[in-house]
């Protein structure tokens, strides 16, 4: 467990350590810290894997109108910076990315505020050179844990 916690903590605290590198496709957030204003929030629990271990995770989503504009991931007491929604031209995923140089990214299956509590997540990763390093994978909705959250 120490090894996994160390990886998660490193990924969430690398904003100052990793240089910003150009991605294959530029992703422009729908909102950023300077213009962030949400109407409501929804917290969802997931069960993810890494190194054949199951790790619980929660994500707090910020909602503006009928759009999910920001996500904040919590794993083992560590909280990510705001991960801002970026458009996916193919509408295959909901993509949330850090506005800082660390390139932390959270992806989920397509969801709206109305379907968040019924939709599986995907991967939590961070930029490592020219590719992404996966922190948590196969994040599945944990309905029982989600039901216990204060929403």
Where are these regions (language model features)?
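Bacterial N-terminal signal peptides that target proteins for export
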Residues: 1-11
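N-terminal signal peptide c-region/cleavage motif recognized by signal peptidases
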Residues: 17-19
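N-terminal secretory signal peptides
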Residues: 23-86, 128-151
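Beta-sheet ligand-binding and adhesion/scaffold domains
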Residues: 93-151
């Amino acid at each position: 467990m120490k090894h996994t916690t160390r990886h998660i903590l490193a990924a969430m605290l690398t904003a100052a350590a990793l240089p910003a590198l150009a991605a294959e496709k530029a992703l422009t957030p729908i909102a950023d810290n300077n213009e962030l204003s949400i109407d409501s929030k929804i917290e969802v629990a997931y069960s993810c894997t890494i190194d054949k271990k199951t790790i619980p995770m929660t994500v707090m989503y910020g909602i503006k109108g009928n759009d999910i504009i920001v996500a904040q991931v919590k794993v083992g007491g560590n909280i990510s910076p705001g991960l801002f929604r970026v458009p996916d031209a193919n509408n295959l995923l909901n993509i949330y990315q850090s506005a800082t140089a660390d390139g932390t990214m959270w992806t989920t299956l397509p969801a709206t505020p109305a379907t968040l509590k019924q939709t599986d997540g995907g991967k939590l990763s961070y930029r490592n050179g020219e590719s992404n390093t996966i922190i948590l994978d196969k994040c599945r909705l944990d309905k029982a844990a989600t039901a216990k959250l204060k929403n």
